[in-house]
Amino acid sequence: MRIDAISIGKNPPEDVNVIVEVPVGGHPIKYEMDKEAGTLVVDRFLYTPMTYPGNYGFVPHTLSDDGDPIDVLICNTRPLVPGCVINVRPIGVMMMEDNSGQDEKIIAVPSAHLTKRYDKVHDYTDLPEITLKQIEHFFEHYKDLEPGKWVKIFGWKDASMAKQLIREAVERAKTKK
């Protein structure tokens, strides 16, 4: 896969593409895209017997403060094939930090042309409370049994903050080229 050939989206940050690395409900394995080789590699086996609460990946042509493309958790119920590209709408961001530093997670839903299921979801607060608790619980605990690793959740921010973080990550990626 040539990641550089994949568009950031039709109308960023309102509408962005995500390259999926880990499917919802998949085995407790963390995959990451090798950005230079364009191939999916096993990053690590999760020590906790937990599965991702959504499809997980990144927005191409972005760069977060942690040096990786911006992370996205897609709220949907169908597992996507790792390596595929899906068009999404950002609806919020979970603010968190781990042993490597700031590591925010953009929360998104599939774009309306893919499904009408999320038409009324414009902000993370439109999701069921249990969905938000499951996302928080997963990220608070998925590294629990890994020596020297930790995670702290600082709360949630709205869709406008998610879009601002995406804009900043796009600009950061442009200046790093």
From Swiss-Prot:
Its EC number is 3.6.1.1. It catalyses: diphosphate + H2O = 2 phosphate + H(+). Its cofactor is Mg(2+). It comes from the Bacteria. PROSITE patterns: PPASE. InterPro entries: Pyrophosphatase, Pyrophosphatase_sf. SUPFAM superfamilies: Inorganic pyrophosphatase (SSF50324). Pfam families: Pyrophosphatase. Disulfide bonds: none annotated. Transmembrane segments: none annotated. Substrate binds at K30, R44, Y56, Y142. GO terms for cellular component: cytoplasm. Mg(2+) 1 binds at D66, D71, D103. Gene3D superfamilies: Inorganic pyrophosphatase (3.90.80.10). It is an enzyme of class 3 (hydrolase). It is found in: Cytoplasm. Keywords: Cytoplasm, Hydrolase, Magnesium, Metal-binding. GO terms for molecular function: inorganic diphosphate phosphatase activity; magnesium ion binding. GO terms for biological process: phosphate-containing compound metabolic process. Mg(2+) 2 binds at D71. Homohexamer. Belongs to the PPase family. Catalyzes the hydrolysis of inorganic pyrophosphate (PPi) forming two phosphate ions. This is Inorganic pyrophosphatase. The gene is ppa.
